[in-house]
Amino acid sequence: MIITSNKNFGLLLSIVCVLGLVACGGGGGGGGGGGDFMPVEPTGLTYAGVTSPAVIDSNNAAELASDAFIGGETGSNLGMFSSVADAQSTIERKIKLYEVVQLFDGALHKIDFSNHRGDLLAVKTEQDTVIGDCGGSASYTVEMNDLNGTFTGLMTFNDYCNGNTFISGTAGFYGQVTVDASEFLYFNLSIDMINLTSGDQSYVIDGDVSVDVERPSSTATVDMLMKDSSGEVFWVKDYTLTIFEGVDYTDVDISGRFYHPTYGYVDLSTILPVRIFYIDQWPSFGELQIVGEDGTKARLLAIDKNLCRIMVDTNGDGTYNFETDDISWSDF
């Protein structure tokens, strides 16, 4: 039986999942599976931007809040607080971090671990190829321990397509499934300088995603660098996403540090869990906060599945003295 995702995340955050990763139930996990294919720490990209805390003000709050939420660069006009009435149709859609993670998660879920069981060997190695939902392929080598369900492997993507997004490159993985190979307990993806293209947007991504699954929630940890087509590198560091799946929605609690190459870093946290219904791309409600230097902060409020708003404390005194007009999620 192929392990499949119970439901898709629709945000991150729509930020990691967010993650369709939570798809499988089971208990928590720990450590790697060992073997010749144990992935190594990615080192291909380097963050060379500002490493001090960002000073959040009325000019950069919307950009920083939305970037921290999405995990990378958003439309540049957000810094000007474009309202619904005057939003620019030319703002290019940026790929959200959770969409990136979903791509790899979906590919990993296509591996039929149960097919690698049943012979007399406790530890066995298998090779196969899976096809993308909209083209391309991903070939993998996986070594699985039949006795305890641990596995480790390497997957190579060749224009692998899902949701009209294409990826090429290599990712190592390891983790553990239940002894009957029906559910993931935990897994780690080590993404090594993979090229990602969606429409006219292109990125190079490098980093790690770890997921512990425990019904009805899962916890994902993300540390990832993303380089856009202009050459700027953004960094999401120690992002933790606690994901709870309801009947027709996903609730996400997010925390972590986001590094913007121009402004510096902000610390992201959740005031109210973000809720995304499975039929929607964006959250219907929830509230996130970023904090920068000297207590300056901004809050991102989801009004509904179409609109959000940013509140800003430019003085660090706890009073929000600036508020944007309603902003369309699509501007992100």
Feature-to-residue mapping (PLM):
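Generic detector of short alpha-helix boundary/capping microenvironments
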Residues: L12-L13, I276
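C-terminal motif of bacterial Sec signal peptides marking the signal peptidase cleavage site
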Residues: G20-A23
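Bacterial N-terminal signal peptides that target proteins for export
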Residues: I2-L12
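Low-complexity, intrinsically disordered segments exposed to solvent
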Residues: G33-F332
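Hydrophobic helical h-region of N-terminal Sec-dependent signal peptides
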Residues: S14-V18
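Bacterial signal peptide processing site
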Residues: G25-G29
